[in-house]
Amino acid sequence: TKRDHTGGYLLTRIDTVNELYAATDNAFIADQYADPSNYKGYYGLGNEIITSFDKLDYIFIAVSSSGAITGISKSVKQQRPEVRIVGVDVEGSVIFGKEGSKRYISGIGASKVPPIIENAIIDEVVIVSQLDLIRGCHELLDEQAIFAGASSGAVYLAAKNHTKYSEHLTVPTSLLIFPDKGHTYLDTIYDREWAEQLAEKLQPAPSAH
């Protein structure tokens, strides 16, 4: 698949799906970026969160199709409006109005703004770099014995830094949503050579004198 103008693959893949749909009789597109069923499927998790926490200040949720953050935020805010929802995205994604650029790690972010995110209730946004995302995954594994994927690593680092610089006099109660496992990232995030090569690619070019 060719990369799209943002440096990702999503838009070209969607174009291919639309071409196949137009050429195929009785075809159906399960568009997770626009189908309300995506976020409505998370209402149950939102209710479970509410019943599990007597005190809850923040929920950190990564975005891609945005089903999770939309469904959880709508469900939680309806019952506990004081809980703050923090959306976590990666540099290069356009979901929160940033300019798109090449992303080397799948599973978080998108090359388009998902229509369903218009229904989300988001209080804060944290953008994590691709290298910090990798660091978050390794810290989760080394310090917490959690073998998680890209979205989880981004959420962990975002929450860790957020709490560090929080204005709260007491440590807030935060819930971190970890939606992915690490086994699909063995050849990327957890491959030391790959990670080192990515770090070299993402190093800023030296300034001319």
PLM-predicted stretches and their roles:
Residues S111, K160-H209:
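Phosphate-binding loop/pocket of nucleotide- and phosphate-handling active sites
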Residues T1-Y58, V90-G136, L141:
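Small/polar-residue-rich loop-to-helix segments that shape phosphate-bearing ligand pockets
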Residues A120-L169:
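Active-site-adjacent helical/loop segments in soluble small-molecule enzymes
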